[in-house]
Curated annotation (Swiss-Prot):
Protein name: Transcriptional repressor CTCF
Function: Chromatin binding factor that binds to DNA sequence specific sites and regulates the 3D structure of chromatin. Binds together strands of DNA, thus forming chromatin loops, and anchors DNA to cellular structures, such as the nuclear lamina. 3Defines the boundaries between active and heterochromatic DNA via binding to chromatin insulators, thereby preventing interaction between promoter and nearby enhancers and silencers. Plays a critical role in the epigenetic regulation. Acts both as atranscriptional activator and a repressor of the MYC gene.
Cellular component per GO, a single term: nucleus
Compositionally biased spans, kind Acidic residues: 610-639, 696-705
Keyword Nucleus: yes
GO molecular function: DNA-binding transcription factor activity, RNA polymerase II-specific; RNA polymerase II transcription regulatory region sequence-specific DNA binding; zinc ion binding
Cellular compartments annotated: Nucleus
Species assigned in the record: Gallus gallus (Chicken)
Amino acid sequence: MEGEAVEAIVEESETFIKGKERKTYQRRREGGQEDEACHIAPNQADGGEVVQDVNSGVQMVMMEHLDPTLLQMKTEVMEGAVPQETEATVDDTQIITLQVVNMEEQPINLGELQLVQVPVPVTVPVATTSVEELQGAYENEVSKGGLQEGEPMICHTLPLPEGFQVVKVGANGEVETLEQGELQPQEDPNWQKDPDYQPPAKKTKKNKKSKLRYTEEGKDVDVSVYDFEEEQQEGLLSEVNAEKVVGNMKPPKPTKIKKKGVKKTFQCELCSYTCPRRSNLDRHMKSHTDERPHKCHLCGRAFRTVTLLRNHLNTHTGTRPHKCPDCDMAFVTSGELVRHRRYKHTHEKPFKCSMCDYASVEVSKLKRHIRSHTGERPFQCSLCSYASRDTYKLKRHMRTHSGEKPYECYICHARFTQSGTMKMHILQKHTENVAKFHCPHCDTVIARKSDLGVHLRKQHSYIEQGKKCRYCDAVFHERYALIQHQKSHKNEKRFKCDQCDYACRQERHMVMHKRTHTGEKPYACSHCDKTFRQKQLLDMHFKRYHDPNFVPAAFVCSKCGKTFTRRNTMARHADNCSGLDGGEGENGGETKKGKRGRKRKMRSKKEDSSDSEENAEPDLDDNEDEEETAVEIEAEPEVSAEAPAPPPSKKRRGRPPGKAATQTKQSQPAAIIQVEDQNTGEIENIIVEVKKEPDAETVEEEEEAQPAVVEAPNGDLTPEMILSMMDR
């Protein structure tokens, strides 16, 4: 009974297919074309016949010696089983999954073979059958002797629309694109004799591809992606929803479609940070806030991420999970390990400057180096005009304001603001307690062995691309030799001014000197309108006039206690100071002449003149005090004497004092008055300076400053006047 039912079904299907063939030939004569991307013809030796259904969109192979049950999966057409039609646009992505069926093995989980949204003009019903029945029919055919084991029976050919791509996905996820030529068989000249044979039409692809990743355990799955981009022709295109071919199997897992294109990046709205993942952006945004939700239960310190907290906990426990493969060292974080290997083992410098030959291990150092080209100093001191290229130097500078000295000598407990200063102190003051490592190539003595390795690598390693001397054309392949050669140019005044006779050793000094000719003052004060030629002058101006916390430095002479605002001025004073109030020199008031004094005098005449003018001002004040304390008296005619010679005045270096002070001292007349003591009868000589007639304003000021002196009627001195003079 089953055989008769199968034969009836086959006859009906053959009748249906022949009717479709006639319609196909008629449409071909009218000049119509089919949309066909792949056509695989069977082998003529198998006695197969090509049967094609254009309206249904299904093309298959009929074989004379094939069991009818095997053909039921593709040929049986049930009337009345037409699925619902839905309109589909040509932009929808169509997917067909192809799997290899091996009839010799046991039943396996093949999933299902499903045709999805194949656009054709007419809807065609498709019946379903199980793969187990297909396998059973194949075994029966083999047992009857009709087929040999391993002989192929079925050849499926499906019409694929224009604009598709066939992709083969392996078991490990690798993707292989199959070209159109690989899908088509080699042409057989015998096929041209077949009246039903029609060569496939060549279509151009539009190069719009989509990848499908779909794998099963231990199997290779071929995935075809349909991407329709055909232009709409006249008329409406309907959609065929194909029924399930294998209904008893579970559907495969959904396939992820990953399209080609530019990778999406996420940008921070507060800075220039970009990243490929949203999670990285969310983690970065926490750096702009004070939120630190992850707290250490041992010390209470909080962190933004769990990773930072985990690394911090490793510092408490002493865990170092990241071990160096080249040595015995281990580190808390992977970044520390990478930095260690680059510094100690690989010597790799991946971050290179595009403007010069500089290369660095860390990206932060490269950014700092690039600022040396651009001149950018983004880190500004809030207390003065200092600006730095990196935060490290700014922190070091801030210690000059706060007075912090974090580095302590472990021998004498002296404290320093910089680690380099502390190391130099240890080498100079405590060399007996420090291990010394001598460089085998030069006279350098280094305290630590690791520093010796750095010295050998940087100073004495061979450089393939030689470095040129910046003063001449000499080229050296060793950094130490280059430095020693450049020292030979140290005392050469190679830079000469083209407008005067000035010459200097460094180029920056020549740049500053030329500003004296051009009048350029590039350094402007941010708080006032003053401009300066040098940065040091701007800093001095800012501290003196705009810094409320600035306290001028006082340089005190250790001999007489006099203070100066400049160190060099105090040094010149100390050379001639004898420790007395008068400030006379050690050689009886004579200035100390020497090489040091002559050099300083020739070096800065302007400073000497300004200092002499400042030093002359106290002399003027002293003279004014003497004038105020002088008493107006008339010399007695009976007793007269010549005024004694004035004491030797202090000789000052530099220009002579002002003319006003000299004239004041020389124009002061003096007189000697002999006074007899009433009790003892002794006569004392009193030297009195006679003051000239002052102006009216001066007289008023003196009258306000001191009480009026009462004179005797005859002009003689009263006892009160004499006592007041003796007291003074």
